[in-house]
Amino acid sequence: MTDKLIIFDTTLRDGEQSPGASMTKEEKIRIAKHLERMKVDVIEAGFAASSNGDFDAIHTIAGLVKDSTICSLARANDKDIQRAADALKPASSARIHTFIATSPLHMEKKLRMTPDQVFEQARLAVRFARKFTDNVEFSPEDGSRSDLDFLCRVLEAVIAEGATTINIADTVGYGVPELYGNLVKTLRERIPNSDKAIFSVHCHNDLGMAVANSLAGVKIGGARQVECTINGLGERAGNTSLEEIVMAVKTRKDYFGLDVGIDTTQIVPTSKLVSQITGFVVQPNKAVVGANAFAHASGIHQDGVLKARDTYEIMRAEDVGWTANKIVLGKLSGRNAFKQRLQELGVSLDSEAELNAAFMRFKDLADRKAEIFDEDIIAIVSEESALAQEQEHVKFVSLSQHSETGEQPQAKVVFAVEGSEVTGEARGNGPVDATFNAIEGEVGSGSELLLYSVNAITTGTQAQGEVTVRLSKNGRIVNGVGTDPDIVAASAKAYIAALNKLHSKDDKLNPQRA
């Protein structure tokens, strides 16, 4: 039994199923690079058969990421598995993850198949997948609600066909720790060839127990892989949180006795990137990555921490990537200093052109904001990377606004559409509403605003505002992000970024439908 816990990240596949979290190929690539930097063992990059956009994203990530195994999901049929294999061809290390439901409810109501048919399809799917790779994972969907005898029969058969990882899915978050942990243990004990595969856990958070169930699967059940997502992102109530699993196992190594190969200093930067791209704000009291995770308000706690940090801190903020809000650069800083700070932050840009564009944005910000923090730099680079990789159908130029107490604000927005400059003017119930009306008056996208969210990147009244806008059109949902010290300007940039995604072809995305 290995003493290492394999971390399988499915942010780009299962996490993307959160309503509104659909990502472009370029956004998936940026997250995949961060996951590789974090030393994630397996990255499930998508579901190749679901769309051309997802296929392309997996194929590109497979060619770019060399230090993590790249995985594609596939239903238990030849067409899906072939598609996954084709997408994974460039990978230096590839895994096909195939699945079929095994619970009576799913077999009868969803698949309309008999248990014998499901058994045969599972067996043949793994056999076919082994033609392309010796790294094959099998998941019995809704495994935690499956008949135990049937589940043992299916899993024994797929291991015999060559499945090297068996993933016990608590698909609807129905499990509780003791029962789920004992389920994994029982399967490993009853299946004669269970020693030929690594057992994995995949839990959802519908009852708020995804992390607890996963850890029980590890400690009680003997699982040696956990499937999880950054920030616990996922449909409904979310998935198992990667950061919580990793830090629980590292902090309580005395109990779990396992090693994880994750570079934990990359956890917070990756959390922030995923939050920015998806528009899902991390709650302040979220374990490990929440803004208050290492804050102490109680006088007794503060006194204890000042005397000895380990009185009230079981892990160090810097170990998971939190940095103090320190002033790092100013308007007199040069390009080399900017580039060096990017390297210190572990941030890379794909080209000199991107670096130059990011530096010009930094200089512009430094002229408007006296103090520049690491968080400002990361926001600049993140937005610049997104702009460089997205085709700008609409491009923000300038904004002016006027408001008086008791009167509707008025906004004037200048922007370019396919290179031709246009000006939109409108009133609204507030400056942001007026700005969006001004843009829509000229563009006429016919989209619906689903979400408007503002986040201060740093502290103080000079802080940059980071705005997320979520738009929907014909059931398609996209996010746009904009940053600026002027909240209304940031709002305009975010709205335009979302419009550009709506304008891009469907096959650039894994199209998410409302």
From Swiss-Prot:
Repeat as UniProt keyword: no
Cell location: Cytoplasm
Signal sequence segment: none
Residues that, per the record, bind Mn(2+): D14, H202, H204, N239
Alphabetical GO biological process terms: L-leucine biosynthetic process
InterPro entries (UniProt xref): 2-IPM_HCS-like, 2-isopropylmalate_synth_dimer, AIPM/Hcit_synth_CS, Aldolase_TIM, LeuA/HCS_post-cat, LeuA_allosteric_dom_sf, LeuA_bact_synth, PYR_CT
GO molecular function: 2-isopropylmalate synthase activity; acetyl-CoA C-acetyltransferase activity; manganese ion binding
Positions of region (Regulatory domain): 395-514
EC number(s) from the headed UniProt entry: 2.3.3.13
Keywords in alphabetical order: Amino-acid biosynthesis, Branched-chain amino acid biosynthesis, Cytoplasm, Leucine biosynthesis, Manganese, Metal-binding, Transferase
Reaction equation(s) it catalyzes: 3-methyl-2-oxobutanoate + acetyl-CoA + H2O = (2S)-2-isopropylmalate + CoA + H(+)
Pathways involved: Amino-acid biosynthesis; L-leucine biosynthesis; L-leucine from 3-methyl-2-oxobutanoate: step 1/4
Cofactor(s) the record lists: Mn(2+)
Family assignment from sequence similarity: Belongs to the alpha-IPM synthase/homocitrate synthase family. LeuA type 1 subfamily.
Subunit (UniProt): Homodimer.
Protein name according to UniProt: 2-isopropylmalate synthase
Organism: Burkholderia vietnamiensis (strain G4 / LMG 22486) (Burkholderia cepacia (strain R1808))
Gene: leuA
